[in-house]
Amino acid sequence: TPTGSTGYSLSCNGPVISPNSKNFIITPIAPHNLNARPMVIPDDTFIELEVDSREKSFLISLDSRITSVPKDTKIYIEKSPFTIKSIIPANQSFLTTLRTKLLWGEDTRNGSNI
């Protein structure tokens, strides 16, 4: 989602997504293939995952919870019908926050701005 997972996505070379965009980001974590790239898809997309494996089961990890799942299991992902309301101070904006946290436009050579 655009809100709350930007840092995780960035740490895996994923994109920055504006909070008002209605998208999901699928970002591979430590891919073994250089062709595995992040993907941005509409948030009304219904995602179905199916693992093709020679093993009898596989591990799935969601929000620090790990469980073993039989190999014929299908995983479905869709947007929740619930939303959250957030408070944004009048003197803050998404782009200003990014610029500050990611040091955009700053000259960080030789520790001059640290």
Which residues are covered by each model-predicted region?
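Catalytic phosphate-donor-binding core of small-molecule kinases
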Residues: 6-114
